[in-house]
Protein backbone atom coordinates (compact mmCIF):
# COMPACT_ATOMS: atom_id res chain seq x y z
CA UNK A 1 0.00 0.00 0.00
CA UNK A 2 1.26 3.42 -0.94
CA UNK A 3 0.41 6.32 1.34
CA UNK A 4 -1.20 9.21 -0.56
CA UNK A 5 -2.54 12.65 0.29
CA UNK A 6 -6.28 12.35 0.93
CA UNK A 7 -6.79 15.45 -1.23
CA UNK A 8 -5.56 13.41 -4.22
CA UNK A 9 -8.63 11.17 -4.10
CA UNK A 10 -10.78 11.48 -7.19
CA UNK A 11 -13.19 8.57 -6.76
CA UNK A 12 -16.86 9.08 -7.51
CA UNK A 13 -18.23 8.55 -3.98
CA UNK A 14 -21.67 7.61 -5.27
CA UNK A 15 -20.11 4.69 -7.15
CA UNK A 16 -17.44 3.91 -4.56
CA UNK A 17 -19.74 3.69 -1.54
CA UNK A 18 -23.14 3.09 -3.12
CA UNK A 19 -22.20 0.43 -5.67
CA UNK A 20 -18.75 -0.86 -4.74
CA UNK A 21 -19.34 -0.82 -0.95
CA UNK A 22 -16.62 -0.87 1.69
CA UNK A 23 -15.31 -2.82 4.64
CA UNK A 24 -15.40 -0.98 7.95
CA UNK A 25 -12.73 -2.42 10.22
CA UNK A 26 -11.86 -1.58 13.82
CA UNK A 27 -9.31 -2.97 16.22
CA UNK A 28 -5.65 -3.90 16.06
CA UNK A 29 -3.58 -6.91 15.05
CA UNK A 30 -4.55 -8.73 18.25
CA UNK A 31 -8.32 -8.21 17.98
CA UNK A 32 -10.25 -6.76 15.05
CA UNK A 33 -13.36 -7.28 12.99
CA UNK A 34 -14.66 -5.98 9.71
CA UNK A 35 -18.14 -5.58 8.27
CA UNK A 36 -19.57 -4.49 4.94
CA UNK A 37 -21.18 -1.07 4.65
CA UNK A 38 -22.99 0.43 1.68
CA UNK A 39 -24.08 3.64 3.40
CA UNK A 40 -21.65 6.46 4.01
CA UNK A 41 -20.40 9.87 3.02
CA UNK A 42 -17.09 11.54 2.27
CA UNK A 43 -16.62 15.27 2.57
CA UNK A 44 -15.23 18.26 4.41
CA UNK A 45 -16.31 19.27 7.93
CA UNK A 46 -14.66 21.24 10.74
CA UNK A 47 -11.78 22.04 8.33
CA UNK A 48 -10.99 18.34 8.05
CA UNK A 49 -11.47 15.62 5.44
CA UNK A 50 -14.15 13.38 6.92
CA UNK A 51 -16.20 10.28 6.35
CA UNK A 52 -19.59 9.53 7.87
CA UNK A 53 -20.21 5.90 8.74
CA UNK A 54 -23.47 4.26 9.85
CA UNK A 55 -23.25 1.19 12.13
CA UNK A 56 -26.03 -0.64 13.96
CA UNK A 57 -25.23 -1.09 17.67
CA UNK A 58 -26.02 -4.81 17.53
CA UNK A 59 -23.20 -5.43 15.05
CA UNK A 60 -20.10 -7.12 16.49
CA UNK A 61 -17.90 -4.48 14.83
CA UNK A 62 -19.78 -1.71 16.70
CA UNK A 63 -18.35 -2.83 20.04
CA UNK A 64 -14.83 -2.84 18.64
CA UNK A 65 -15.36 0.63 17.14
CA UNK A 66 -16.44 1.84 20.58
CA UNK A 67 -13.22 0.47 22.13
CA UNK A 68 -10.86 2.09 19.61
CA UNK A 69 -10.00 5.60 18.45
CA UNK A 70 -9.37 4.60 14.83
CA UNK A 71 -11.10 2.57 12.13
CA UNK A 72 -10.42 1.89 8.47
CA UNK A 73 -12.64 2.01 5.41
CA UNK A 74 -11.34 -0.40 2.79
CA UNK A 75 -12.51 -0.45 -0.81
CA UNK A 76 -11.81 -3.73 -2.61
CA UNK A 77 -13.15 -2.88 -6.05
CA UNK A 78 -16.01 -4.43 -7.98
CA UNK A 79 -14.55 -7.80 -8.96
CA UNK A 80 -16.39 -11.07 -8.41
CA UNK A 81 -13.90 -11.91 -5.63
CA UNK A 82 -14.50 -8.55 -3.93
CA UNK A 83 -18.26 -9.06 -4.12
CA UNK A 84 -17.91 -12.48 -2.44
CA UNK A 85 -15.90 -10.88 0.38
CA UNK A 86 -18.41 -8.04 0.79
CA UNK A 87 -21.33 -10.47 0.81
CA UNK A 88 -19.70 -12.71 3.41
CA UNK A 89 -18.59 -9.87 5.69
CA UNK A 90 -22.02 -8.28 5.42
CA UNK A 91 -24.00 -11.40 6.25
CA UNK A 92 -21.85 -13.25 8.81
CA UNK A 93 -20.87 -12.06 12.27
CA UNK A 94 -17.32 -12.00 13.55
CA UNK A 95 -18.79 -13.45 16.75
CA UNK A 96 -19.38 -16.71 14.87
CA UNK A 97 -16.87 -16.75 12.01
CA UNK A 98 -13.19 -16.02 11.42
CA UNK A 99 -13.75 -13.67 8.51
CA UNK A 100 -10.06 -13.54 7.58
CA UNK A 101 -9.90 -17.32 7.30
CA UNK A 102 -13.25 -17.60 5.49
CA UNK A 103 -12.56 -14.83 2.94
CA UNK A 104 -8.81 -15.03 2.40
CA UNK A 105 -8.39 -11.38 3.34
CA UNK A 106 -4.79 -10.50 4.21
CA UNK A 107 -4.62 -8.05 7.14
CA UNK A 108 -2.06 -5.24 6.92
CA UNK A 109 -1.20 -2.92 9.80
CA UNK A 110 -1.39 0.83 9.11
CA UNK A 111 0.87 3.54 10.54
CA UNK A 112 -1.49 3.97 13.50
CA UNK A 113 -1.84 0.23 14.15
CA UNK A 114 -5.25 -0.10 12.52
CA UNK A 115 -6.04 -2.98 10.19
CA UNK A 116 -6.37 -2.63 6.43
CA UNK A 117 -6.31 -5.40 3.84
CA UNK A 118 -3.80 -6.22 1.14
CA UNK A 119 -6.66 -6.70 -1.34
CA UNK A 120 -7.86 -3.09 -0.88
CA UNK A 121 -7.44 -0.78 -3.83
CA UNK A 122 -8.05 2.15 -1.43
CA UNK A 123 -8.00 2.35 2.36
CA UNK A 124 -8.95 5.36 4.45
CA UNK A 125 -7.70 5.36 8.03
CA UNK A 126 -10.03 7.40 10.22
CA UNK A 127 -10.15 8.83 13.75
CA UNK A 128 -13.49 9.15 15.50
CA UNK A 129 -14.66 12.74 16.01
CA UNK A 130 -18.40 12.57 16.71
CA UNK A 131 -21.13 10.02 17.34
CA UNK A 132 -24.90 10.30 17.43
CA UNK A 133 -27.75 7.83 17.64
CA UNK A 134 -30.48 7.77 15.02
CA UNK A 135 -33.99 7.75 16.50
CA UNK A 136 -37.47 7.83 14.96
CA UNK A 137 -38.08 11.29 16.43
CA UNK A 138 -35.12 12.80 14.55
CA UNK A 139 -36.39 11.78 11.10
CA UNK A 140 -37.87 14.76 9.27
CA UNK A 141 -39.01 12.55 6.39
CA UNK A 142 -40.99 9.83 8.16
CA UNK A 143 -41.16 7.78 4.94
CA UNK A 144 -37.51 6.88 5.58
CA UNK A 145 -38.55 4.92 8.65
CA UNK A 146 -39.55 2.12 6.27
CA UNK A 147 -35.85 1.18 6.19
CA UNK A 148 -36.04 0.14 9.81
CA UNK A 149 -39.34 -1.74 10.27
CA UNK A 150 -38.40 -5.41 10.32
CA UNK A 151 -34.70 -4.82 9.71
CA UNK A 152 -33.69 -4.12 13.29
CA UNK A 153 -32.63 -1.06 15.23
CA UNK A 154 -31.43 2.33 14.16
CA UNK A 155 -27.84 3.04 13.22
CA UNK A 156 -25.28 5.00 15.17
CA UNK A 157 -23.68 7.73 13.08
CA UNK A 158 -19.93 8.30 13.31
CA UNK A 159 -18.19 11.33 11.82
CA UNK A 160 -14.54 10.37 11.43
CA UNK A 161 -11.52 12.34 10.29
CA UNK A 162 -9.62 10.76 7.42
CA UNK A 163 -6.08 10.78 8.84
CA UNK A 164 -4.35 8.62 6.23
CA UNK A 165 -5.14 7.31 2.77
CA UNK A 166 -3.49 4.34 1.07
CA UNK A 167 -3.75 3.16 -2.53
CA UNK A 168 -2.59 -0.05 -4.11
Positions of predicted regions on the chain:
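Active-site-proximal mixed secondary-structure blocks
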Residues: 1-37, 41-168
Amino acid sequence: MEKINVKELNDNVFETIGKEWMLVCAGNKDHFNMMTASWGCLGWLWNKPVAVVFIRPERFTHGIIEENEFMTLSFLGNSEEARKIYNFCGSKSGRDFDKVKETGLIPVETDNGSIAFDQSRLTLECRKLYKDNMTAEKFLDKDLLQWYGAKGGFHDVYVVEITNAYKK
